[in-house]
Amino acid sequence: MEQAIAPPLPIRDYQYQTPSIPGSSDYAWRTFVFVTFGLLIAVGVAWLAYTLFLKDLILVCKAKKQRRTEEIGYGNTPARLNGDQQGLPR
């Protein structure tokens, strides 16, 4: 018994998808938009972190190198009346 070879089924318009070329402008725009949004989100997170707690962390680190935390930002504080210059090298 011979097997009948069926003719190929026709491809309808809604079944066929044109292959996308990786170098097309659509791919380039998609990459550009993805990178741009990624950078905006990264800058936003960095700004928010600086605003919320990094600024204070930097001041505390500077305070450890200098005198005390209360005296940060006020410039050179004068010596105390009892002559105690706490935190100054002798």
UniProtKB/Swiss-Prot annotation:
InterPro entries the UniProt entry points to: Gemini_mov (IPR002621)
Subcellular location: Host membrane
Topological category with respect to the lipid bilayer: Single-pass membrane protein
Biological-process GO terms, alphabetical: transport of virus in host, cell to cell
Record bears the keyword Nucleotide-binding: no
Transmembrane segments: 32-52
Key words of the record: Host membrane, Membrane, Transmembrane, Transmembrane helix, Transport, Viral movement protein
Matching Pfam families: Gemini_mov
Recorded GO CC terms: host cell membrane; membrane
Family membership: Belongs to the mastrevirus movement protein family.
General function of this protein: Involved in the viral transport within, and between cells.
Quaternary structure (record): Interacts with the capsid protein (CP). Part of a MP-CP-viral DNA complex.
UniProt protein name: Movement protein
The organism of origin for this protein: Wheat dwarf virus (isolate Sweden)
